[in-house]
């Protein structure tokens, strides 16, 4: 709102293609399952199944990035992803995918890069107060993985911002984001 532009919020991926469980269970049942189940609870351990699942969702990114670009970006919208492709790199288990990071990382090279990428994190105890999806060890591992990923991605470019922000205080976090956007 401070930038005086319309905003659209997308979750995790463009969602041009439905989640896979919609194809097998139907839309309502899949939606109920998504709401009632915690992330990272899938039982998939197969490389082939993971590769097929990842390929399906990657296709959604490949096609969807252009749909989002023409539908929103060119019309002046600010597009905010709550999560993005980075989950496939660092937390593919969340999508019931078990693949080496090298495979999912390569895929990022062929996607349009958001101009600004912010990883908002907090210490494990704060996160556990908000929601109990993961244990403290997993939260710490994921936080370290995302911080490391963002540091490495930032080293590869000057045209895209990859910034990790400790999200302890909302006002400070928002101020940090706005300053970063205005500065660029």
Predicted regions: what they are:
Residues 1-9:
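Post-Walker A helix-loop "phosphate-sensing" segment adjacent to the P-loop in P-loop NTPases
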Residues 5, 112-116, 156-160:
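Short glycine-/polar-rich loops that comprise or flank the Walker A/P-loop
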Residues 8-10, 116-119, 162-164:
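Hydrophobic/aromatic beta-strand patches that form the interior of the parallel beta-sheet core
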Residues 13-95:
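ATP-dependent small-molecule kinase phosphotransfer cores
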Residues 15, 85-87, 123-125, 169-170:
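Short, solvent-exposed loop/turn segments at secondary-structure junctions
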Residues 77, 81-84, 110-130:
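Conserved phosphate-donor/acceptor-positioning beta-strand/loop module used by diverse small-molecule
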Residues 102-113, 149-150:
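Substrate-engagement module of ASCE P-loop NTPases
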Residues 125-184:
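NTP-dependent small-molecule kinase module
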């Amino acid at each position: 709102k401070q930038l005086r532009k319309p905003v659209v919020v997308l979750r995790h991926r463009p969602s041009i293609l439905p989640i896979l469980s919609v194809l097998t269970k139907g839309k309502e049942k899949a939606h109920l399952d998504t709401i009632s189940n915690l992330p990272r609870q899938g039982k998939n351990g197969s490389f082939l199944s993971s590769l097929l699942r990842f390929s399906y969702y990657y296709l959604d990114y490949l096609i969807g990035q252009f749909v989002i670009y023409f539908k929103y970006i060119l019309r002046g919208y600010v597009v905010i992803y709550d999560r993005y492709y980075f989950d496939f790199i660092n937390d593919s288990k969340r999508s019931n995918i078990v693949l080496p990071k090298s495979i999912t990382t390569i895929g990022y090279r062929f996607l349009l890069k958001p101009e600004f990428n912010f990883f908002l994190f907090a210490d494990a105890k704060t996160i556990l107060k908000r929601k109990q999806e993961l244990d403290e060890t997993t939260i710490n591992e994921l936080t370290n993985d995302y911080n490391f990923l963002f540091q490495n991605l930032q080293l590869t470019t000057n045209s895209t911002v990859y910034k990790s922000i400790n999200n302890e205080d909302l006002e400070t976090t928002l101020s940090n984001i706005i300053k970063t956007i205005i500065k660029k």
